[in-house]
Amino acid sequence: KGVLDRAEFEARNDQFFADYKAGTLNIDEFLDFQLRPLRDNKRTQLAIWHNQFMAEVIRPNMKPSAIELVKHHQADNAVCVIITATNSFITQPIAQAFGIEALIATEPELVNGEYTGKVTGVPSFREGKVTRLNDWLAAKNWTLSSFESSHFYSDSINDLPLLECVSHPVAANPDHKLAEIAQTRGWPVLELFK
C-alpha cells in the first residue's frame, strides 16, 4: 500500500523468518519490526488494510484440511485455543475465521486507542507460550491436567517448550529441526497444506 519500503521490508522479514526457522530469532528485535506499522498508522486505517488482507490473502488460503481438523476437535467438545507469537491485531480475525474464540497471541500495547509499537506482557514465543497458556488456564481455574488430553500442533522448533507440555504433541508441516525431533520421539507428523 506504499506505507513501507517493500524491498527493505521484505529483506528484513526474510531474515527474521530465516532466524525463526533456525530457532535463533531475537523476539524483541522482531517485535520492534513487526509492530512498527501498527505504531505508525491509525487503527481505522489498519482495520481497512487488515480486512483487505483477510479477503485477498487469508481466506483464499484457508486449507480445507486445517478447517476440518479444527471442526473435528470442536465436535469432540475440545477447548480450542490458538497460541501464536504473531500479534493479536493480525491473528484475532484469523482465529475468528476458523471459528476459534480463544486466542493467546503477543499483545500490542494500546494507549489512548492507538498502538504504541510496544508489547504488553510476555510475548507468546518459545517458553512465553507456556507461560501465557498457564496464565490463561489459571484465569479459568484450570491446568493442563484438568483435561483428559491436550493437543498442540506446531510447525516450528521454537514451539518445543509447549509441545513438551501437552499429552499429544503433533508436528504439522514441521521445519527440518522439528521434523527430526518428531521422528525421534515418535510424534505424529501432519502435512496440512498438501
Residues of each region from the PLM?
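C-terminal cap/substrate-recognition subdomain and adjoining C-terminal extension
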Residues: 48-51, 55-194
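A metal-dependent, Asp-based hydrolase signature
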Residues: 1-72
